[in-house]
């Protein structure tokens, strides 16, 4: 056969992309991550809390649970048929889901991934129920009858300015059964803020992530100007507030497309973002002395993981993702083995400020996992990250991180960086 052979690439079905990646720090890969790991604390047993994508994992980060399909009054109703997840294998495919959103199903141009997980007759539910029933412990049963929960990526029901989001692939405004850490902090007069790169002074660029702020889904926040202002910040606001010493006590900082996501970004772009955030905090000595920076990523990006995954509930857990704790109080050069996931960040905030779990069904109700046990002795359980700190032996020095210039094209999924000021 001679000549150039061409063929059309298959259309993406959005059911997994890149499977593996390899980074070699011994040859210079990820120098900033390496420096942070050597000087502060990391975990080899931290997980995404939902076996799903970016949106669902950001929602659980702020609520300990999930968003659901609701009507204009906040009543639980069924979504259009084309938006209901059906993981049963589609005949004639390599185990592709029968219906997995974004235009599939009986309703064109909709699609999505809602599951009525309290109904064993709903697609895919009985299989998970049977799996959970065989566990040597009782998983958390937090699916509520009649509710269809979001498992993957949908835009928030509100734009960041508080107007209704009328675009496709949008979860309805969350009027009932949706309590965020922002609500809880405000109720206890603790300052908080969400800083999204690309916010652009109220005119979000394409790079701004519309699915990544868990507070932006909540009617209670987005229709209340005094609460809504807490989500109307960008990267420049974060840098200036850190310099001036008026950063909110709990601050969520979100990169745009310099997020290191597999397939379209690069790790050294993400490292530059992290280095800039760390430098902003360390550049204010008073702020640095009372701050914990938690650096994590929303989900694996499709990468395979061989580690233990604890079945916690219908929703997860999922594979391991990185977390680093950068703080004067972080254990130096420490690798934590305690079982943690994204809800551990909620539990950390709640432990630090003496707050209660958000709701009766949120996963911050779970007990703390056994310290340094890769598999918790009592399950289900997740840690609160306190095992990564030693408050008796602070080290207030700072490190200079190498920064390289880099830019990446706009894309769609972003890992979160959380910054918390300790009380």
Please provide the spans of the model-predicted regions.
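N-terminal pro-sequences and low-complexity stem/linker regions of secreted or lumenal proteins
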Residues: 1-423
